[in-house]
Curated annotation (Swiss-Prot):
This is TGF-beta receptor type-2. Heterohexamer; TGFB1, TGFB2 and TGFB3 homodimeric ligands assemble a functional receptor composed of two TGFBR1 and TGFBR2 heterodimers to form a ligand-receptor heterohexamer. Disulfide bonds join C41-C74, C44-C61, C51-C57, C67-C91, C111-C126, C128-C133. Transmembrane serine/threonine kinase forming with the TGF-beta type I serine/threonine kinase receptor, TGFBR1, the non-promiscuous receptor for the TGF-beta cytokines TGFB1, TGFB2 and TGFB3. Transduces the TGFB1, TGFB2 and TGFB3 signal from the cell surface to the cytoplasm and is thus regulating a plethora of physiological and pathological processes including cell cycle arrest in epithelial and hematopoietic cells, control of mesenchymal cell proliferation and differentiation, wound healing, extracellular matrix production, immunosuppression and carcinogenesis. Its EC number is 2.7.11.30. Residues 24-155 are extracellular. The active site is at D369. It comes from Gallus gallus (Chicken). Phosphorylated on a Ser/Thr residue in the cytoplasmic domain. Its cofactor is Mg(2+); Mn(2+). Residues 177-557 are cytoplasmic.
Length: 557
C-alpha cells in the first residue's frame, strides 16, 4: 500500500469504529453538505521522555486518536522540572488556552516547539494541523547551514531611533509612577472607609470553605493525597451507585498500616467514557471550586486492569447516599427542609459565582444536569453537589459557536423550557445559569413534598410524577412543560405553614417560563437564610418583596 494512503485509511477506519459505538458523536461531526472527518493526532497523557529541547525528536507515542471536534488541532507540551522531563501529546481547541497560554501557531503543518513561561521550570509547546504532526517535535526551526543575514541598518538609522527610544521609556516610567501613586491613594481611602465588623478576614473565610468538618475524609489524608504522584492503595468494596457514564464504589483508602483506612468513594469510568471523566476531572481540579456544599475531590487516576484501561475519580464518601434515595426513605422536618434547601442553593450559587468568598477571580460553572440523584446528603443533613460530567465552564473566551456546540444535555424530566425547545440565548452566558435554577426549583419541590410541615405526607415521587413515564423523553416533556405549561402540583395544604409557603413562592419564581424572570441561586440562598426564623420575618428578601406580619407573601417580579 502506498505510504500516502495509510493515514487516510487509518482515519476512515477509526471514524467508522467511533461512529458505530457512538452515533451521537458521528451525527455531531457531520455537515449538511457531506461528512467532514476530524483530525488524527498523537494522544498520550503526560509521561517521562528522553526527548531533549535540541533540534528535533519523536514523541514515541503509540496512540493515535480522533479529535473530538473538527476545529481541534494537534498539540504537544514538553516540560522539564528539576531533573524530570515529560511530554504530553493531545488534541486541542486553538481558541482556548492550554496551561494558561494561547497557541498562535495552529495553522502550521509542523510541530515547531516554542518556549513558554512556566513557574515550575522549562516548558515548550506547539500546535499544528498536519496528520499526526505532533509526533515529530521541532525545537529549532532555523537551518544551521544557512548563513546569518547581514545587518542592513545603517548608523544613521540607529542614531535616529535612539531619541525615540528614550522618549518612549520616559513616558512609560511616568505613566507607571502615576498609576502606582493613584493605586496607593485608593488603597488608603478604602482602608479608612471599610468597616471591619462587616467583613470576615479572608484567611478565616478560606479556612471555613476549605476545611470541611462534615466530610468523611480527614484533612491530613486529603492533603497527602493532593501531593501524591503514585496510585493510591485503594481496596474497592461495594457498588453504591450506577449512572450513564460510570459506576460508584464505596472503597477503603489504606493508611500506614493495613488496619487503618479512610472510607472514600471511587467513581470508575470505562475506557469509552474518557471524555466524561476528563470533563469532571478538569472541573474538580479547579482549586477555586472547593466549597462545603460541593463534593470534596481527592484525586483522579488512570488505571490498567484485567478489563482494560479505566479512569478513576476519588472523592469523599457520604453514607446517607443521594437526595432522591434519602427522600424516598425518610420524611423530613421543616428544619431539615431549611438545611437541605439552603445548602443546595449555596452550593449552586458558589458554582455560578465569578469569585470565591475570599474575592479571588473564579470561572463560573454551570452544572447542566441538576437533579436529586446528583446531589448527596451529608451527615449533618446538608447537601453537596456531585456528578459534573456534563458541566460547562463559562470561560469569557468561549464564542457563541462554542456554546452552541455544547448541545442539548441533561435529564429530560429536569430540563428547563428553553432547553427542551433548544432556544437558549447564547449571547448571554447567564442563560445557562437560569437553566440550573429551573432544575433547582424541581429539586426544592421534591424536598417540600416529603416535609411533615405540609400535613399528610405522600410517598416520594419525582417532579411531574405519574404525568410522565419513569424515564420520559424530551418530546414527552415538551408536551407537559411547553404545550400545557405544566409544573409539579402545589397543594393548598402546603400554604398553611408560613415557612413552606415562602419556599413555594420561591420555587415558583425559580421555575418561571421566562428565564429572565427567575431568581438567581444567590438570591435563593439569601432567602433561605431568612426562612429559618420565618415567624419573625418582617423585612425584605433579596428580591425586595414585602412580607407582611400575617405571613402572606406578595411577590414583586
Amino acid at each position: 500500500m502506498p505510504p500516502r494512503l495509510r493515514p487516510l485509511l487509518l482515519r476512515v477506519s477509526l471514524w467508522v469504529l467511533v461512529g458505530s459505538s457512538s452515533p451521537a458523536l458521528l451525527h455531531d461531526r457531520s455537515k449538511e453538505n457531506g461528512l467532514q472527518l476530524p483530525r488524527l493526532c498523537k494522544f498520550c497523557d503526560v509521561k517521562a521522555t528522553t526527548c531533549s529541547n535540541q533540534d528535533q525528536c519523536k514523541s514515541n507515542c503509540n496512540i493515535t486518536s480522533i479529535c473530538e471536534k473538527n476545529n481541534e488541532v494537534c498539540a504537544a507540551v514538553w516540560r522539564r522540572n528539576d531533573e524530570n522531563v515529560t511530554l504530553e501529546t493531545i488534541c486541542h481547541d486553538p481558541q482556548k488556552r492550554l496551561y494558561g497560554h494561547m497557541l498562535d501557531d495552529s495553522s502550521s503543518e509542523q510541530c515547531v516547539m516554542k518556549e513558554k513561561k512556566d513557574d515550575g521550570g522549562l516548558m515548550f509547546m506547539c500546535s499544528c494541523t498536519g496528520e499526526e504532526c505532533n509526533d515529530v517535535l521541532i525545537f529549532s526551526a532555523i537551518d544551521p547551514h544557512k548563513p546569518e543575514e547581514k545587518d542592513e541598518i545603517s548608523k544613521v538609522t540607529i542614531i535616529s531611533l535612539v531619541p525615540l527610544l528614550v522618549i518612549s521609556v520616559a513616558v512609560i516610567v511616568i505613566f507607571y509612577a502615576y498609576r502606582t501613586h493613584k493605586k496607593r491613594k485608593l488603597n488608603k481611602a478604602w482602608e479608612k472607609n471599610v468597616k471591619p465588623k462587616k467583613h470576615k478576614d479572608c484567611s478565616d473565610v478560606c479556612a471555613i470553605m476549605l476545611d470541611d468538618d462534615h466530610s468523611d475524609i480527614s484533612s491530613t489524608c486529603a492533603n497527602n493525597i493532593n501531593h501524591n504522584t503514585e496510585l493510591l492503595p485503594i481496596e474497592l468494596d461495594i457498588v453504591v451507585g450506577k449512572g450513564r457514564f460510570a459506576e460508584v464504589y464505596k472503597a477503603k483508602l489504606k493508611q500506614n498500616t493495613s488496619e487503618q483506612y479512610e472510607t472514600v468513594a471511587v467513581k470508575i469510568f470505562p475506557y469509552e467514557e474518557y471524555a466524561s471523566w476528563k470533563t469532571e476531572k478538569d472541573i474538580f481540579s479547579d482549586v477555586n471550586l472547593k466549597h462545603e456544599n460541593i463534593l470534596q475531590f481527592l484525586t483522579a487516576e488512570e488505571r490498567k486492569t484485567d478489563l482494560g484501561k479505566q479512569y478513576w475519580l476519588i472523592t469523599a464518601f457520604h453514607a446517607r447516599g443521594n437526595l432522591q434515595e434519602y427522600l424516598t426513605r425518610h420524611i423530613i422536618s421543616w428544619e431539615d427542609l431549611w438545611k437541605l434547601g439552603g445548602s443546595l442553593a449555596r452550593g449552586i450559587a458558589h458554582l455560578h459565582s465569578d469569585h470565591t468568598p475570599c474575592g479571588r477571580p473564579k470561572t463560573p460553572i454551570v452544572h447542566r444536569d441538576l437533579k436529586s440523584s446528583n446531589i448527596l446528603v451529608k451527615n449533618d443533613l446538608t447537601c453537596c453537589l456531585c456528578d459534573f460530567g456534563l458541566s460547562l465552564r463559562l470561560d469569557p473566551s468561549l464564542s457563541v459557536d462554542d456554546l452552541a456546540n455544547s448541545g442539548q444535555v441533561g435529564t429530560a424530566r429536569y430540563m428547563a423550557p428553553e432547553v427542551l425547545e433548544s432556544r437558549m440565548n447564547l449571547e448571554n452566558m447567564e442563560s445557562f445559569k437560569q437553566t440550573d435554577v429551573y432544575s433547582m426549583a424541581l429539586v426544592l419541590w421534591e424536598m417540600t413534598s416529603r416535609c411533615n410541615g405540609v400535613g399528610e405526607v405522600k410517598e416520594y415521587e419525582p417532579p411531574f410524577g405519574s404525568k410522565v413515564r419513569e424515564h420520559p423523553c424530551v418530546e414527552s416533556m415538551k408536551d407537559n412543560v411547553l404545550r400545557d405549561r405544566g409544573r409539579p402540583e402545589i397543594p393548598s395544604s402546603w400554604l398553611n405553614h408560613q415557612g413552606i409557603q415562602m419556599v413555594c413562592e420561591t420555587l415558583i419564581e425559580c421555575w418561571d417560563h421566562d428565564p429572565e424572570a427567575r431568581l438567581t441561586a444567590q438570591c435563593v440562598a439569601e432567602r433561605f437564610s431568612e426562612f429559618k426564623h420565618h415567624d419573625k420575618l418582617s423585612g425584605r428578601s433579596c428580591s425586595e418583596e414585602k412580607i407582611p406580619e400575617d405571613g402572606s407573601v406578595t411577590t414583586a417580579k
